[in-house]
Amino acid sequence: MGKIIGIDLGTTNSCVAVLDGDTPRILENAEGERTTASVIAYTDGETLVGQPAKRQAITNPQNTLFAIKRLIGRRFEDEEVQRDIEIMPYKIIKADNGDAWVEAKGQKMAAPQVSAEILKKMKKTAEDFLGEEVTGAVVTVPAYFNDAQRQATKDAGRIAGLDVKRIINEPTAAALAYGLDKKGGDRTIAVYDLGGGTFDISIIEIDNVDGEQTFEVLATNGDTHLGGEDFDNRLINFLVDEFKKEQGFDLKNDPLAMQRVKEAAEKAKIELSSAQQTDVNLPYVTADATGPKHMNIKVTRAKLESLVEDLVVRTLEPLKVALADADLTIDGITDVILVGGQTRMPMVQAKVAEFFGKEARRDVNPDEAVAMGAAVQGGVLAGDVKDVLLLDVTPLSFGIETMGGVMTKLIEKNTTIPTKADQTFSTAEDNQSAVTIHVLQGERKQASYNKSLGQFNLEGIQAAPRGMPQIEVTFDLDADGILNVSAKDKSTGKEQKITIQASGGLTDEEIEAMVQEAEANKDADKKFEELVTARNQADQMIHGTKKQIEEAGDDLPTDEKEKIEAAITALEGVKSGDDKEAIDAKTQELMQAAQKLMEIAQQKAQAQQGAQAGEQPKQEDDVVDAEFEEVK
């Protein structure tokens, strides 16, 4: 089995790691960075990912997509999506199936399709390091992701050409990275994960029994729409409001200006983690009839904290719930680990320390721990890591809708996965010949307040008084936290099974079409790369030949010179075009035309070498070799 890589597919940044021996190693991308910005830009004929995409965002805001993870597995009508529509510079649209999609360069795309571009870059980074093709991956998701979001993440992997061997929760992955080298006594750790777009808290018990380490998740909680992007947006809104007060101009109507403000706000937020004050200085941020407008606003750490305090406080309630679900008090927590870039904010660190009554550990890299843990799990699945057992849980309860619009739970939240549960139900009316199984995920008693995962019918039930037929419903939850459901009429043996796919989500046909499109683009990308290489070779050939013509001077016969210059002109005429074969052919013609030039250059070089050899001083005949004695 080949290497199974670990990928942290983040809202703001993504990261890839691989097991190197028995140690997880973070891999640098083509730009030499250990993390890759989760930004995708569509330009004329090219798709940019990471820093190159981020760099051109100011001039191309409508076609530069970021924070796509906030849309993955989401419905367009979701409250969180509607909030994002108001603040995102790019277009969020409603797909035919009701999902939240995006539009760039006139093309409509599903969130998994866009996320696949990031996964492709992670895959390529790993392949460049390993020198071989990579197909297997462990991909992390927020612990509080629901079934639809997990399924959509797997779909993204498939579109990127990856076989996602396992989906694991981000806090669990961080615990794996932290605990792998910690031998000794048992510990219970709290992983507080505040990333770019999501927040999770997991309580994890690490046991050492006879040399085997068991990582058991006791409870998890969180908010899949709370993260660094929300902190950024608070600061962006403050800057825009201040500018409006000073200049009487609303920047929200200017996408280019808003992109500059967004970048400046991100930078200011990061600076305020180490400084008490920073200046947001944007000359020529916009202009009107009176002339150019400049932004120059001082922001203090205290001001930023006042803008986001309620967001930080919002993370504390899930901590209380997770502790209660784990049947623990704060005294039972051995260590606190902070994961996610937003945990670098001093206020976040202070609030967490205040809650747990202890400082968080400083020996975990908040940006890299999750990918490292995913690589460890990849090693476990590949059989490279022994004596490590991971027991994760489902973050939310699963059930079905029963009479009166009630949700009846079959699998409770925080149940260790994989797991299986069944329950027998009956009909609500006399002589009922079919039942609809409506599958739900959530904690509310009223079915309509929970997430609908889909529904199916079991037909052909024998006529009988209500309450007599016995219908066995089985829920089978796999290690990725994805659900399979079956319903069986015990009297007839008739059975109906489905793998839960939310009422939205991508069909197998749609995923396959996207895989084919990705493959087609792969060929197009390869051809583009080959074209650029041919152009570069042509440029080098032209430059080198012109230089040799100068150096040859009068030694080059006029007719030869004219022949070479004609070949140069011919190559210059095609090198900027898109016909690689034409560029290669004209490059070859120039090489042949310049044959005489090569000969002259070679003759000159040989003559020069001969002259240098002739100038070397002759050894004098009367020089006597001295004898010497080694003194020991």
UniProtKB/Swiss-Prot annotation:
> Gene3D superfamilies attached here?
1.20.1270.10, 3.30.420.40, Actin, Chain A, domain 4, Substrate Binding Domain Of DNAk, Chain A, domain 1
Region Disordered, residue ranges: 601-632
Q: Which CDD domains match?
A: ASKHA_NBD_HSP70_DnaK-like
Q: Which residues fall in a compositionally biased region of kind Acidic residues?
A: 622-632
**Between which residues do disulfide bridges form?**
none
Q: What is this protein called?
A: Chaperone protein DnaK 1
Write down which residues bear the modification named Phosphothreonine.
T198
Q: What is the lineage of its organism?
A: Bacteria, Pseudomonadati, Pseudomonadota, Gammaproteobacteria, Vibrionales
- Keywords in alphabetical order, please: ATP-binding, Chaperone, Nucleotide-binding, Phosphoprotein, Stress response
> What induces it, per record?
By stress conditions e.g. heat shock.
Comp. bias intervals (Low complexity): 601-616
Which PANTHER family does its entry note? HEAT SHOCK PROTEIN 70KDA
Q: What InterPro entries does this protein's entry cite?
A: ATPase_NBD, Chaperone_DnaK, Heat_shock_70_CS, HSP70_C_sf, HSP70_peptide-bd_sf, Hsp_70_fam
Q: Which HAMAP family match?
A: DnaK
Recorded name of the encoding gene: dnaK1
